Every structure is written in structure tokens, then in C-alpha cells.
């Protein structure tokens, strides 16, 4: 494998329920990219947008070459084909990693999945198939998956497709919640990229998001 190379895969919800948060999402995503560009090591970026359809926006772009997200890229519409987006991303990355020469394969693969609603529109993939795919890559190759969900029990939903409670968190789907989300994700991805063993990073990564959600629901 190629030391210090990370494949970053961002799966972003742009379904209609994200309306009103377009600029917050764009700003948060761009700030996260800027932060990643400051880190040591190489990274390729794959960005997948989904509503009732799945769109590949960045296809393993070198991190330094990824342009900022704009409203031409990110606009909301439609329903939530969450499983199709995850399945497409995992399938794509599996094919890439398997077919590259061993010395060109990424040392780490990190998925960040963000959605504000439950699955309701997928046609190709179901929960059981996604669970098998994710568990295989986690167990055999140490891939990391972070799941951030709003308007749901994110831990329970993540468990349905093979992501553990220590890698799932519920966030508040408003401007402040989205900002906290991207800040935490950015710092967590930085830690995972620099860690000898990303799996050693525990559930503490999500404490700030949990605290933000809890605070607003106590007010």
C-alpha cells in the first residue's frame, strides 16, 4: 500500500428537506476541504451527492486540486436514495482498491456519510446488502465509516447497515448544527489521517455534536 495516502469519500444529502441550508452546507464543506489541505500526507477526494438520484461530483480528485463547492454543484431536490449512494460509493472504492497495484493502494479509506432523513428512494441497494459490504471492508481492510444523521436515531439507523455506535451521531439540522458537524468531521478526519491506527480513535470524536444537540433540546 502507499503510505500516507488516504481515500476520502464524502456522501452528502441534497434532498429537498435540506432546503434553506444550502449555503451552510457549502460553507462547511469548503472549510473542511481547506483544513484537510493543511494536513501532511496525500489524499484523494470522492464526493457523491444524492437525492432520488446519485451524482458523482469528485472522482478521486487529488485533494489539492478540488475546487470549492458552489451552488451550481449543491442544490436541493427530490427524495432520499441514501442506500444507493452508500452502495455506489463502497462499490466504486472496492473496485479501485482491488485493481490498483499493491504499492498504489491507499493506506486508509474514510467514508463520511451525512443525511437529514431516512432512506426512501433507493432502487439498487437494500440494508442487508449494504451491511455486508461495509462490514467486509471494515473487518478485512480497516476502512472507516462515519455516519451523521438528523431527524432520526442515527445510532440505530447506522446499525442497520453495519456502522457501529461509536461512529454514528445525531445532529441538529440547522445552521449551527451543520457548522458544528463540519468542524467536528474535519478535525476527526485529520486525526484519522494522521493516526497509525484510525480504529484507535474512540467515540469521543462526536462529543461536541452530541453536546450541541442536547443543549438545544434542553432550552
Q: In which residue ranges do the predicted regions lie?
A:
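Acidic, low-complexity intrinsically disordered regions
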Residues: 1-219
Amino acid at each position: 500500500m502507499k503510505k500516507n495516502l488516504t481515500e476520502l469519500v464524502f456522501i452528502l444529502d441534497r434532498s429537498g428537506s435540506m432546503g434553506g441550508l444550502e449555503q451552510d452546507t457549502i460553507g462547511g464543506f469548503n472549510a473542511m476541504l481547506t483544513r484537510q489541505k493543511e494536513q501532511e500526507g496525500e489524499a484523494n477526494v470522492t464526493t457523491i451527492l444524492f437525492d432520488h438520484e446519485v451524482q458523482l461530483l469528485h472522482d478521486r480528485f487529488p485533494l489539492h486540486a478540488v475546487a470549492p463547492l458552489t451552488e451550481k454543484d449543491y442544490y436541493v431536490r427530490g427524495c432520499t436514495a441514501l442506500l444507493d449512494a452508500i452502495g455506489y460509493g463502497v462499490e466504486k472504492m472496492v473496485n479501485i482498491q482491488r485493481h490498483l497495484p499493491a504499492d498504489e493502494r491507499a493506506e486508509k479509506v474514510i467514508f463520511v456519510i451525512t443525511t437529514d432523513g431516512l432512506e426512501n428512494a433507493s432502487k439498487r441497494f437494500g440494508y442487508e446488502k449494504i451491511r455486508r459490504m461495509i462490514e467486509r471492508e471494515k473487518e478485512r481492510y480497516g476502512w472507516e465509516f462515519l455516519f451523521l444523521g438528523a431527524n432520526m436515531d442515527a445510532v440505530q439507523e447506522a446499525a442497520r447497515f453495519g456502522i457501529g455506535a461509536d461512529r454514528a451521531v445525531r445532529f441538529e439540522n440547522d445552521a449551527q448544527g451543520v457548522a458544528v458537524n463540519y468542524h467536528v468531521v474535519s478535525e476527526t478526519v485529520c486525526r484519522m489521517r494522521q493516526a497509525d491506527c484510525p480504529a484507535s480513535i474512540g467515540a469521543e470524536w462526536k462529543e461536541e455534536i452530541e453536546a450541541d444537540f442536547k443543549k438545544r433540546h434542553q432550552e
